[in-house]
């Protein structure tokens, strides 16, 4: 894969006052998406999974345009010239990222070409109409007339008819037509409904899978759409629109506001038009003028548009070209209590590692709460959940059983707003007390609180997680679930629910740190503690695992820690604005990213506390927040300290250690912001963290501080440290 446009900077010029100490946020995100694309090129992955990674990278890029590029364009239109943390104006950032996107899309098309060749070798083929046999042509014509033709709506464009609306991600064919009778010429558009498959499977023969693109089929039978006309020019194009929603603080009815905003979003500003290279110039110019977009919004691609749709091919029954099926385990501690979640949690705090351990435990916890006559109250946050959500069903069942049920439904969850409005109404109809939280703050914390009568007292059971209450995503996202009856944590969670529902500040919180109130200061306090330890000659270390590291204040604190001699290992899946390896500033910081079969999603923070990591003395936290200004200042987030010795060791000695020593699915983040695949050094054993967890699933089953698998991880870490020092 070709080198991308690097963030060119001279390291010798960087100081703690120079904005160049930060990597540009948009560039760093594009580098993450490039890592996803590199998995499409990774021959260790099964072939159809590589095609899926290509689809994911294309979907990611669409969302990047809809939100981030749209945001830059809006700033430019508004005349904003303020610089980003790395010192670039909106216009400079836009120019920078568009150049990077051009490289990324070239790489995507190049990878598709490679994959098509390998797919063909495995009897899977995307053909053009010229490759159809006569039998196939007859079959596909019938398919066209039965399935495609009835839903096509040709739109002619002339001075009498305004340019038609093209929806977000709308895929269309543009045509220059000439009437055979009198050579009258006009332009028409043919939008492709989203209900149509992009790649149509031909009848299977001899275990061969052949597909033809929908637009090729339409082109082949255009005579049915425009009889008595000749096609003089043709090509496909695709539109991407601004899809962000800006919440107005004065909005009185939040549900009504979002319903209206969602309608507006469908007609958002066009931010990108992608044209097929073979489209004639005059057609391209006609569409550009009709949509009234500037030149920078236009992109011409010599290949397939909408690469996200190649995921349709992945579903074919070729399990030999896919990851082997994986069934998550039921946690042993739950099995020991015959599935009784309350009995298991009452005995001891529990940490569960998804997707290696089943998310069904979380669902069952709420189902049992709904059906248990001793449960009197349930409080629940909902940020994202599945279409047929068992979580929502459990809350509805609990309310119908007469229990007091409160649900905090976050309407501002991007691209899930419509679903959350629907869930909120369903819950309210069942008698659930529904809150939407703050208008200006997005509730991102993942919390369940169940209050149960036990004898003469009331006991609170708490679930806290790093991931959403989404059973489908929980099968592919790596996250932590934590169950406890700790009175202080239950007290803090109750305070936070009151804060969200009644705006009562949780000033008496005992253990949990909350954003936007105390989470930032708690992280900074612990970083400063490690700096103090290092300056006093003690050992000092920080481990963090997050999805994004963007916040300038946190990054500068980590720089100061590095300068003081604190050893810092960061596992950052996505955006990382910290620039490692700057002489005198970040020499002691190592940043890596893991991209693999499962999407890394957990947020974990570990501080040495006067000794090296890993250690029983370490301070360990998990939470819902990434290190970004929006998470620290504009969201409701939680940071949960882990005091239970067993749980602390499970998180530190298994999850974090495995992530740090992984050398099979990991990338080093370099000081120019680009990525480099990590390979084992001479004398270093290969280790794949995700495969390790699949083979050794069960944080909740670990009964000793060190079992044989943990000892193995520690040995591998010591090996890695020794090689690093040498």
Swiss-Prot record:
It comes from the Bacteria. SUPFAM superfamilies: Phospholipase D/nuclease (SSF56024), PHP14-like (SSF143724), PPK N-terminal domain-like (SSF140356). One of its GO terms (molecular function) is metal ion binding. ATP binds at residues 60, 477, 573, 601. Its cofactor is Mg(2+). Catalyzes the reversible transfer of the terminal phosphate of ATP to form a long-chain polyphosphate (polyP). This is Polyphosphate kinase. It comes from Bartonella henselae (strain ATCC 49882 / DSM 28221 / CCUG 30454 / Houston 1) (Rochalimaea henselae).
